């Protein structure tokens, strides 16, 4: 055999090997997913950052990019435009989107409890003890939790003032209570040495889920395995973050949001565990991330009752349990 023939065969063999290598690489390539949060990085987003930092997404065959939300970020718009594959959502937002005919769907709930609550001075006994108080409510709250609180306890719009995310009015007046998240405003009060109480609305019957995973109906239809792996890995991330070593996620959180301190992150993790937002309720037995039709129906009923949603909205289009019903990943 001539040397030219041998060289030709060698080149052919190398080309074939290269082609096989490319095919194998393509087969093993991780699926890319862009996840958009609802705000700046914080402990309340820790499960997703943990799944990224600890390699849980990678083990699931996913290359996940986490993008922070913020006050000027329209998450739903970015999701529908294809700039994000999954976003951190909210039940009211999703049901309103369904009413508008938008192709979105909730695939899991990180938290069994929405994180919205009320911060009050330490003499206040509970959410039923606000009749003589001034209640600070931000604009979005007037079309979500405030109608529920107002009806449940007989409060009035005359009690409310605008919440501008400035805590000074609260600090200066013991007759003021205000909307709050468990690890944000109470932490700032703690830094001031001011004793406060925090009342989570979910513990008083407010029905929406918290920190949900929302995607498009197209992704669920065309890439269900990607959705399934993303949900499972994210839930494993939450279990690891809240019950294990959170330091991998915390490093990423601080890299994305340098204003977030170790102290505030630790305070946030402590409060999330104390309030059992991820592993309480149905999640105790059915697993973190679980959703039920009954809970979604309760949110739909609330919105319709308060005139926030048309009664003919097909609320069942707002969620699917196919990715969470059989996982049963508990914290125990």
Language-model regions: role of each:
Residues 110-118, 190-223, 227, 231, ...:
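Periplasmic-binding protein-like
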Residues 221-308:
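Secondary-structure end/capping motifs
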Residues 45, 76, 91-94, 143-147, ...:
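Extracytoplasmic/secreted envelope proteins and their assembly/folding machinery
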Residues 16-17, 27:
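Cleavable N-terminal signal peptides
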